[in-house]
Design a protein with these regions (language model features):
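Class I SAM-dependent methyltransferase SAM-binding "motif I" and its flanking Rossmann-like core
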Residues: 110, 114-137
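N-terminal beta-strand-loop-alpha-helix module at the start
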Residues: 1-54
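Short phosphate-binding loop-to-helix
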Residues: 61-83
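Long, charged alpha-helical interface segments
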Residues: 130-198
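Short Gly/Thr/Asp-enriched flexible loops that form oxyanion-binding sites at enzyme active sites
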Residues: 99-109
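A glycine-rich helix N-cap at a beta->alpha junction
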Residues: 60, 65, 116-119, 143-144
Length: 198
């Protein structure tokens, strides 16, 4: 089952809010539902970024203690995984503060380790994990790859820059490649994080 989780960071493309997902507002992300008068299935947060007290557009509410050792997004993912969700789409979690962006990378890795998959969107890019093979058909544009493992073994075929070999965690080797025709990225060992232009 797929869940849409909406965080507080800025984005313009609200079309996702109208699609058939189980919709979760992550604290300040509730503004997007409230401002557009769209119902969400669940609100999760400690209300530290909301100046809206009216949570009437949320069918269910989980109010967290502000003195906690887990982020709203990690709490939500744990809750949803336990409810049987294994596919996650994130909006409003890939802009703004650098530490929150890094948190999203950690969350992407965590979801994978728990058997789920996720894609993070902003208006310009999407971020996702590759651990087997990712094929490209009609997509075009920039893509950057980084190893989430200490060292990954990869094959890049039919992108602007082809490559077969090792990619280490502290390498910029696969920064700013381009999808120019049908091709693929294959991970033989390790895990990659991809930032792909939308």
């Amino acid at each position: 089952m797929t869940s849409l989780l909406v965080g507080p960071s800025y984005f313009k493309d609200i079309s996702f809010l109208y699609e058939d997902y189980y919709k979760v507002a992550l604290d300040g992300g509730y503004h997007y539902f409230f401002d557009n008068r769209i119902r969400c299935d669940l609100f999760i947060g400690d209300n530290d970024t909301n100046d809206i007290l009216d949570l009437s557009l949320a069918d269910k509410k989980i109010i967290l203690n502000r003195d906690k050792d887990i982020s709203d997004s990690f709490y939500a993912v744990d809750y949803l995984l336990d409810k049987g969700f294994d596919d996650f789409v994130f909006l409003g979690c890939l802009n703004g503060r650098a530490d929150m962006n890094y948190l999203s990378v950690s969350l992407l890795s965590y979801i994978d380790k728990r058997g789920g998959k996720a894609v993070f969107y902003n208006d310009d890019e999407m971020m996702y994990l590759i651990k087997d093979k990712k094929e490209f058909d009609d997509e075009r544009g920039r893509i950057s790859l980084f190893s989430l493992s200490d060292e990954s073994e990869i094959e890049i075929k039919n992108l602007l820059y082809e490559y077969e070999g090792k990619l280490s965690f502290d390498s910029s080797l696969c920064l700013s490649n381009r999808i120019v025709k049908p091709g693929y990225i294959k991970v033989k060992k390790g895990r990659l994080i991809a930032f792909q232009q939308r």
